Amino acid sequence: MNMEEQILNDYLLSQGRLQSIISLEQWRQLFPQRYREDPLIERLYEYCTQQRQKRLAKLRANIHLESQVIGKSRIDRMLATNVEKLQTVSHASTLHDVEEFYTSHSAKPLDISEINERLSEAVQSAYTKLNEEKERCTQLTLKMNSQIASLSDFQWSKEPNVDESIHLVESLIESLEKAAPSAIEELD
């Protein structure tokens, strides 16, 4: 814990707990006489204590986070100052050595025409890939639509399995006609 974090904790959290601000007895004195012994008063005090504890926990977390951010910004400022100092170095060889040592790669910088050419190639490559993917998606969509259309029995107002149903009904009627004379004789 750094010094700033310690100061913020001491200043903001020293009287943070509800019990250090007001006791349960003092809390009860805030309410009318007839309600002072009600258990709800004690539950309300406990609830307020819990809420206060949650706020203090958030405050502690924010203090810690802020101290980390402040520490990081100090480091960033120190690095920026060091970079400025390095940029003002008058001796060219020292500056070149420092730049070479601190750069992440030692590639030679490109001129603007090379950069423009490479960017144009990259854009063209991206457009080519995009068009290929669009064509592939179109082909897949057509294939999917044809498969879905072939599965539909209602295409061209055709009812599903109508021929099979008609055949079953006709065979049932024939068997009933054959059985009907014998059934009529049994009823007589």
From Swiss-Prot:
Its main location: cytoplasm. One of its GO terms (biological process) is chromosome segregation. The keyword Nucleus applies. Keywords: Cell cycle, Cell division, Centromere, Chromosome, Chromosome partition, Cytoplasm, Kinetochore, Nucleus. Pfam families: Cnl2_NKP2. One of its GO terms (cellular component) is cytosol. It is found in: Cytoplasm; Nucleus; Chromosome, Centromere, Kinetochore. Coiled coil: none annotated. Belongs to the NKP2 family. Component of the kinetochore, a multiprotein complex that assembles on centromeric DNA and attaches chromosomes to spindle microtubules, mediating chromosome segregation and sister chromatid segregation during meiosis and mitosis. Component of the inner kinetochore constitutive centromere-associated network (CCAN), which serves as a structural platform for outer kinetochore assembly. Component of the inner kinetochore constitutive centromere-associated network (CCAN) (also known as central kinetochore Sim4 complex in fission yeast), which is composed of at least cnl2, cnp3, cnp20, fta1, fta2, fta3, fta4, fta6, fta7, mal2, mhf1, mhf2, mis6, mis15, mis17, sim4 and wip1. This is Inner kinetochore subunit cnl2. It comes from Schizosaccharomyces pombe (strain 972 / ATCC 24843) (Fission yeast). The gene is cnl2.
